[in-house]
């Protein structure tokens, strides 16, 4: 997962190019779902760049609310990674974080649209793509609580605990469809404006822990399904935007402004295609 700010949406907004549907995978579901719910690119950019991601990625309450014993224990901190044995089996946590703070952020981000049950009833029809962890199949959310669909789509294995909803377990949609061209086609669109960020492989020095290894495995799976999607793009009518994010990686949330600027520059390069 890398930053995905709506580069093409920002430019199409300026050029007054109508957007009839939005489809998003992983961080793209956060961006796409927010845009479909009515947020302007400017407001979305402001929210994403100003939020404290360190707080979002911490399931703990503020330190001021800790009991005295825990505050004292924090003077000699240890790595909090719970491992245990139950019924003779090794038990590990489902993810580094449960994602409670992230879910609250999503709820607030699309406030006013979180009660819309059919995504076709949003200001712009929307689909979020996730992976069904039980059978490995692609899951396309077209209804339900919007923040839940967004959270399910970007439940990066190893980082976030899987999302359980409607009797199913979901993880990041990038595992099966990082560039959901076929989903957009099925919604009946004539022209697709796609943003392919790719996953990018982590350098060796970042593969020394479980999150690094998990991230690399996800990147490998993602890069295997993207070429299939790229073949579905019609160069005569569709527009493909490929920002060069350089060394900006999945965890560089503090570098969101750089990622946005790079994305906007890439979108402007294809402005003639967007205007045709």
Identify the role of each PLM range.
Residues 1-25, 33-276:
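Patatin-like phospholipase
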